[in-house]
């Protein structure tokens, strides 16, 4: 009787072993276990974003203009750069004349379309607005006005390496300035647009920029053999 009990127990144990093997063979692979990767961004600091190439506005490949007006404004929402508009030296004429601004020259010898650059690194998609004003008429150093002179910006467009869906919602293709009239709209990036670096360029390359920025001077205006200059104010608002 004792042997029979032991034999029966051994048989039961062997059966359990077979069940364990069968259960293991029934497992499903591959097995999955989820982990997580995280990163948190905050608004950019006051570091100035360098000027980008207006033809190919890649922030990782900046350009170096020969004659920048000054450093950008800095900040998380900033105007990084704006071209000077140079109309050269011209002969005095008693006929109406239109003069054209030269392209923006770079230290590597290349010439680019004139432009203004805005960067939004706030991370809020809140939007912004860029306007242009000419507080006063062209004047000499002694205050003599170039009466009737008018600046017109044409072929204007927005360009960026950022996805097209973030393009500013309103882009003025032409701006005609009247001295003393403020806030002529250049670009309006409404909510959910305008993120990253954007250029407002006058022509897409040097060739199309040649006659894009115009200065009309009436023949009847008195012209002294001196340099005339005017201030242009680009204003960036948080909307």
Q: Language-model segments: which ranges?
A:
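Signature of Gram-negative chaperone-usher
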Residues: 4-7, 21-239
């Amino acid at each position: 009787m004792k042997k029979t009990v032991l034999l029966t127990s051994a048989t039961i144990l062997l059966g359990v072993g077979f069940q364990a093997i069968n259960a293991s063979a029934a497992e499903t692979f591959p097995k999955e276990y989820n982990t997580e990767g995280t990163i948190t961004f905050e608004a950019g600091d006051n570091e100035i974003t360098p000027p980008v190439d207006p033809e190919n506005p890649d922030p990782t490949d900046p350009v170096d203009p020969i004659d920048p007006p000054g450093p950008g404004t800095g900040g998380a929402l900033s105007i990084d750069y704006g071209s000077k508009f140079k109309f050269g030296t011209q002969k005095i004429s008693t006929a109406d004349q239109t003069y054209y601004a030269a392209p923006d020259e770079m230290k590597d010898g290349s010439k680019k379309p004139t432009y203004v650059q805005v960067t939004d690194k706030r991370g809020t998609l809140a939007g912004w607005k860029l306007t242009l004003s000419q507080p006063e008429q062209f004047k000499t150093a002694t205050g003599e006005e170039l009466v009737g002179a008018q600046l017109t910006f044409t072929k204007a467009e927005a360009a960026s390496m950022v996805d097209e869906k973030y393009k500013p919602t309103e882009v003025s293709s032409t701006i005609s300035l009247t001295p003393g009239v403020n806030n002529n709209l250049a670009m309006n990036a409404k909510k959910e647009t305008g993120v990253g670096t954007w250029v407002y360029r006058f022509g897409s390359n040097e060739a199309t920029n040649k006659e894009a920025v115009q200065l009309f001077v009436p023949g009847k205006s008195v012209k002294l053999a001196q340099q005339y200059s005017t201030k242009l104010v680009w204003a960036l608002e948080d909307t």
